[in-house]
Design a protein with these regions (language model features):
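Compact, glycine-rich, soluble single-domain proteins
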Residues: 1-75
């Protein structure tokens, strides 16, 4: 069962299963957040915004409202 990326704890590695909001799909795809890609949640800010991730060897920061639309499975 897939979980929202926004609900994953720091230090966990997951695999993207889908992006559920069309408006941000292209932006996330350009950053490497595509189905099948591994993501490591590096750090989460105290109020959960932003979330620092590593995807395709790059460090990225996502807003909470972006991370909630990325569905993932734990490895």
């Amino acid at each position: 069962m897939s979980t929202k990326l926004s609900e994953i704890a720091a230090g966990k590695t997951v695999v993207v299963t889908s992006v559920v909001k069309d408006e941000i799909f292209l932006k996330l795809m350009e950053m490497g957040c595509v189905p099948g890609e591994k993501i490591t949640v590096e750090q989460i800010a105290p109020l959960k915004d932003p979330i620092s991730i590593i995807v395709a060897g790059y460090k990225l920061s996502l807003r909470l409202n972006e991370a909630q639309y990325i569905l993932v499975d734990e490895i």
